[in-house]
Amino acid sequence: MLLVIDVGNTNTVLGVFNGNTLIQDWRIRTIRESTVDEFNLLAKALFVDKKIDLSTIKRTVISSVVPPINSILDTFCTRYLNQKPLWIDPASVKNLMPICYSNPAEVGADRIVNAVAAFERYKTSMIIIDFGTATTFDAISAKGEYLGGAITPGVMISAEALFQRASKLPRVEIFRRPQNVIGKNTIDSIKSGIIYGNGALVDGMVKRMSKEMGTTPKVIATGGLAVLIADASETIEIVDNALTLEGLRIIADQPVFSEGQR
């Protein structure tokens, strides 16, 4: 079986594939101060809970935007899984997708993985929006080229800044959009601004990016808050929260990688 790991600034997502089927996934906090042994204990507990034997993991592929975690995961794989993981970066996927960036090495591994997965699934021009610690917009051409994108502060980062800097505003939990855009109390007004405001941000960015692309791209959202913001957006067509994990599987199954890891 294949273990895929996507390390983000806030959360780390792990998934186990049996062939092309994702049989289990977990979302845990990214803890930069964690040790190899601590990560091993956590991983073992997760696997035992789902009755998955670590010894059945024959290959591991990782994307990470948190360098301090990389050595921990690398050692975990070699010490406890008896294998070297495949690390994803722009150079490792250059044969799968041309990256039209002035410096391809600057593109986050997660963004490239999303792009590879989305193009493999939909085979058309598209804009991928990933709602993570940052909200990223990535444009893919109909030829499967990574054209570039945009980065904005994430939904929760923006909300946290508001709560910290505006002392009279209460901290609110954001689980569902309010019924009305015009809030009738402070809490609903904050929820409206955060949720509908981010929905409008998405729609505005999609409109501008589509104009530059000269196409009508398919708009795909992923990430922890994708469902919530998609409900407030007029342009998001598909929510695919397994996109990054699926992209890691697709890359790992390319002959140049899979043969080297067997």
From Swiss-Prot:
Cofactor or coenzyme needed: NH4(+); K(+)
GO cellular component, one term: cytoplasm
Record text on cofactor binding: A monovalent cation. Ammonium or potassium.
InterPro entries assigned: ATPase_NBD, Type_III_PanK
Cysteines joined through disulfide linkages: none
Record localization: Cytoplasm
Binding site for ATP: D6, V7, G8, N9, T10, N11, T12, V13, T133
MF terms in GO: ATP binding; metal ion binding; pantothenate kinase activity
One GO biological process term: coenzyme A biosynthetic process
Active site residues of this protein: D110 (proton acceptor)
Enzyme class: transferase
Nucleotide-binding keyword on record: yes
Pathway assigned to this chain's UniProt record: Cofactor biosynthesis; coenzyme A biosynthesis; CoA from (R)-pantothenate: step 1/5
UniProt KW keywords: ATP-binding, Coenzyme A biosynthesis, Cytoplasm, Kinase, Metal-binding, Nucleotide-binding, Potassium, Transferase
Enzyme Commission numbers on file: 2.7.1.33
Pfam families: Pan_kinase
Principal location class: cytoplasm
Residues bound to K(+): D130
Sequence positions that bind substrate: Y101, G108, A109, D110, R111, T186
Catalytically driven reaction(s): (R)-pantothenate + ATP = (R)-4'-phosphopantothenate + ADP + H(+)
Subunit structure: Homodimer.
Function (record text): Catalyzes the phosphorylation of pantothenate (Pan), the first step in CoA biosynthesis.
Record family assignment: Belongs to the type III pantothenate kinase family.
NCBIfam families: baf, PRK13318.1-6, PRK13321.1
Protein name, per record: Type III pantothenate kinase
Taxonomic path: Bacteria, Pseudomonadati, Thermodesulfobacteriota, Desulfobacteria, Desulfobacterales
Name of the gene encoding the protein in the UniProt record: coaX
